[in-house]
Amino acid sequence: MSMKFLTGLQDLLGLYETGTAASSPASPIPPTSPAMFAVPPQQQSHSAATSVRKKTCQDANSSGEDPNGRIRQCSHARTVSFPADMDLITGYHEAPSSLFHSYHDSQRVIDSSEILTAYREACQRRQCAPSAAVEKQIGYFHKSPDTRQELLSLKGERVSHAQMEALEEIFKRVQFNTIDFEYTFLDDDCAISLGEMIEFYDSCVRLNLSFNKQIDMRGWTTIFRSIRHAVSLQMLNLRYTNLNDRSIPALCKMARAQPSASLTCLHLENTQMSGKNLLVLICALKNNTGLRELYLGDNGLQPTDGSHIYQLITSNSSLQLLDLRNNSIGDSGVRHICDGLRHREAVEKSSLSAMVLWNNNVTGASMDSLAEALIENTKIETLNIGNNNLGVEGIARLKPALASNSHLHRLGLQNTGINCEGAIILAECIADNIALLRVDIRDNPIALAGLLALHSAMKMNTSITLLNIDASCVKLSSEKVREYQDEFERYFREIQTYCDRNKDDVLKRLTVTFDDEEGDSGVEKKDGNECEGEDNKDRQDTPAETENGVSSNESKLENEEVGVSKPESNNNEKSPLMASSSTSKLSRKERHQRFVRSSSLTCTETVHDIHDRLREMSGSTHSLDAAIAAAASNSTMQNLLTVSYGSNPGPLDSSSNSESMKTIKKSFTVTAASSSSLPLAEWGSLPALPQASPSSTPVVRKLRRFSVSPSSSVFDVATTSSAASSTASSPIPENSIALPVRPSTLAIGIPIIGSVPAGPSSAPLILVEDHKDGPITSNQISDTERRISEEIERQKKDEQEIEKSCRSVIRDLLNYVEYEEKSQVERKASLLLRNTFSRPNPEELLRNLRLSEATGSTTPRTPLTPSRYVQVFNINSFLKLYFIKACILRVLEIAEELEGESDEQICQSVIRCLVRDVLQAEKNELRSTLDRRRRHNSVRNSPV
């Protein structure tokens, strides 16, 4: 600093050393053009001095013998050099990527035993029990690394955060078509881990998270972000989940993503997706080009929500299936939807081909709007308006669209109030219709007249391959036509024969034959879904045929439509072969797997225990889990950790996954830590309140990506000792390849089963694993177990002391209350006995009786008069007997009153009185406070 100051002062004053100035040959450079670049004499002298100074400094610095010596003069010409950039980098590594993205090794073989061992060791490290259903499914994995495994299901099991983390050992080695976490009570931590694994490992094509109401905003945010970045995920089932105002923006952000995510099917049944939430979602889906199927059933949609559906139909160009079952849209909402179908944008750009309006309080009044929409919009192929009170009026208004329609293939009219008159109108429509493939008119009061009309219509129809009608229509209601019973049954069977005839005709038109010159065997492929098409026109697959998870009777109906002939080998005959377009569609449909619900004409509920599930999910179960975990003993923990690794699971059959498919129906047993008087529903609604201890040292769970867990919101950067079990996991073989693991910014601490909570701030005592190189010694294991046992013993002693003091206080209170109650009862009893057994005076009673008869008044109440009687007879003997009987009855009542009540009942009554007094005092105080405020306000507001 001082050197720069002196140099600047020297330049300002022009003071230089004499020898240096004299020896300097530098001179100012004259300007090239004196006329244009004339410099005043003062500036010329200053520039000359500056040049002399720079030259002198350069000579002085260059003439030094020691380059590392002390610099005595300033030089602005010195430079700083650095080594080459490549020499600065000592090493680097690529960003972590999953095994399935980094390379493709065709020689790799999936080893089920290795996956099973890794999964068990992961469960052991995280102090949790492995799932028996998962172990069975691991044994069923095929060995091809190029093909995804079919299914990983934990349906109906309680999955904790530790168990979810242990599943990473499976996800890092195997990919699946379907991952089913239905009804597994996932929370935010489980959802965050699952979302990160799905995004990193690209684990599945279809993901089922239905019936999980404990997931909140943090979990949904991670799930939706992972789905937005997932490459293969196509179907997401969020049925009966807790989507609220805070989590819906994350869903909308995923829907607005450009380019659109790979998601094509979204189930949002019973997620409160109505009103504002529905409007926000539809605004996000306006420009979405990837979604094909949207399920919005059981959301309580109102007629006003029909305008939101109108915006979705007119703006979205990729949606093919819209399911609105079990709502309350009504006639006005249906009119809004029909206006959207008739809109010019929808007619030109919309891809909507299937719509489900099952059970929406629709009547026949809105069927004229629906008929006009079907006439103008020629893209609707499947329409299900079942379970609505349409009646004959609705069918009559729908008749113009059904008679002239050439594009509607499937019509659902189940339980719509169609009688014989409606069946006759419907028969008139289908007689000449060449587009309908399936009509469902089950659960309607159709009798013999309707059956005859449908029989005549099906005799002329050439397109319908399946007509669903109840067999009860054949039953005769009159004895006069009993002799025609066999004939009516024959008509019913002939309807099925006509359907089979139409199916065979379509198959014949879709097949071609050729001469087999090389002698290869000929194979005829037939598919009922393909026979539902037009002649040789390549139609687009409708969602109703490629739906997931149909009910039992629906599967039977679909199977009736499908006919596959066995391969026949004949070298001399002609071999029929399906057309190329049909073959491609057949293979495409065979690859599509059924997963959840059916969107075809049958909309009955497929979950048989849905009411039990809803009752179980009505309250939070974290308190139950905490109580059960806290009550687990060390012996139970050792049994969970010492899992037999030698047993290899056998191959799975159809019933091997029965454990995971069962729904949780067991009642939870609460240990001594919880009161047994409370029912299950009340325990489900209570929050988790860990016990407090005097010395509290909150220990922290460190979560990846800096996410905060609601169960432990107190954080500490200090690490704790590592927790290891006696049965240490076997080391990984040296020849095994280290699989890449998804990145985690922070370590995760998993609580040990049986650990006690510590701290008044309800932060649980959690041991965080310290992943270090090298094996775990026996000394570390013994120290850890000793510390845990000491902590448990100390906590038990504190609890015993607190319980002892509480018992003593309660005992004193009970003794005092019992004494007060007994003394009061005894005083009352003595008074009553004294009054009752006092000697009666007959003369006085007779005098009072005569006086009452003269005046017409009733007998006065005296201590000698019994309370139960109001009249005294004038017979002395009867009076004596009467008084003796009254005294005996009163004595018996007092004895029963004294002996009937137990100590517990007395305590309960006293406690009720105390609580009632406290509440009454608070009520009076609140009332007086309000009165004072009113008086104060009235005085302040009164005019002066």
UniProtKB/Swiss-Prot annotation:
Gene3D superfamilies: Ribonuclease Inhibitor. Residues 522-542 have a biased composition (Basic and acidic residues). Residues 543-554, 567-585 have a biased composition (Polar residues). Residues 586-595 have a biased composition (Basic residues). The keyword Acetylation does not apply. The keyword Aminoacyl-tRNA synthetase does not apply. InterPro entries: Leu-rich_rpt, LRR_dom_sf, PP1-Reg/Actin-Interact_Protein. Keywords: Leucine-rich repeat, Repeat. Transmembrane segments: none annotated. It holds the Pfam family LRR_6. Residues 42-71, 517-598 are annotated as: Disordered. It comes from the Eukaryota. LRR repeats lie at residues 203-224, 232-255, 262-282, 290-311, 318-338. Belongs to the PPP1R37 family. PANTHER family: LEUCINE-RICH REPEAT, ISOFORM F-RELATED, PROTEIN PHOSPHATASE 1 REGULATORY SUBUNIT 37. This is Protein phosphatase 1 regulatory subunit 37 homolog. It comes from Caenorhabditis elegans.
